[in-house]
């Protein structure tokens, strides 16, 4: 049985105040073309379908279009909510969507039930586990000792052990310890939100979302597929791809990838103002790519951002690197500001006030308080 593993679409995302919606539709159309040429038995969507809990209407319409296209191809879809999503909004209409073979994780209320599929090798069970926080699990099992994210995941998986006679696929959205991160991801200080890869040992394949770099964690079959598009300049040198996973007889899993080509690449360019405005330099380049330009001029160029955008209309970020400034003084910095979590803000404040960092226990306690406050705000 063959699946396409996708995650972190982040529909509606803005990078340095540039809307990515047109680029997102372009890459989704490319993914549909891949599916037309590479048959699969289902699509796994491992969370962060949207970039915000309350997405813009255009993003909602784009996801609706994409799911409709998959349903018209009679492809089962297995989707979960991520930390950027509102679980309630993602789960809206889930019971109706099942009639079109679109299976969406409900708001977490207990151990996920397997969704059985069959092929010539027998039964394959798909488990949908939305993004988990310890408070969610304590609410369901108040007598369980759940303090950390690892405790929370371990508790849930104890209550839904996969049938050892069946092949099993888990779709989840957590930060697994040991994985590599990018600037555009939300990862808590001290790794308080991390879980251990060994918790997934009972599953044949674990389709993960949350991290934007494609990578395995521990074993080949515990995998982040990464984002289909680059969402930060820390990803500029990455090559995005679609991840296909095929499960044969029990224990046999193979993984292949197909490259994805964006409408506009996201690149870093370096040079002096004169070099970058020399037609011979840029004539054969994709000047409409999303760019981070670093100028090496010793003196600031007046109105450099506007003047460079005449040639490079999608210039997102402009820095200088010279003798006077070696600390990467950003002229536009919304990308980094959006990526700082509340815990990171408090941790920096605490260290400034106390001249020492938060301990792991303090960070875990603060993270718990932050989540409780946010939960109260969502319920208000």
PLM region spans:
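N-terminal active-site segment of His-dependent metallophosphoesterases
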Residues: 1-68, 72, 362-372, 376, ...
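Hydrophobic/aromatic beta-strand patches that form the interior of the parallel beta-sheet core
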Residues: 4, 44, 78, 105, ...
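Accessory, non-catalytic peripheral segments of nucleic-acid enzymes
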Residues: 37, 42, 247-380
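Divalent metal-coordination and catalytic microenvironments
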Residues: 8, 28, 43, 48, ...
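Glycine-rich phosphate-binding loop signature in dinucleotide/nucleotide-binding domains
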Residues: 35-39, 119-120, 162-165, 284-286
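His/Asp/Glu-rich metal-coordinating catalytic cores
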Residues: 55, 84-218
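A short helix->loop->beta-strand "cap" motif at the edges of active sites that frequently abuts
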Residues: 72-77, 166
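Binuclear metal-dependent phosphoesterase catalytic core
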Residues: 112-124, 129, 222-287
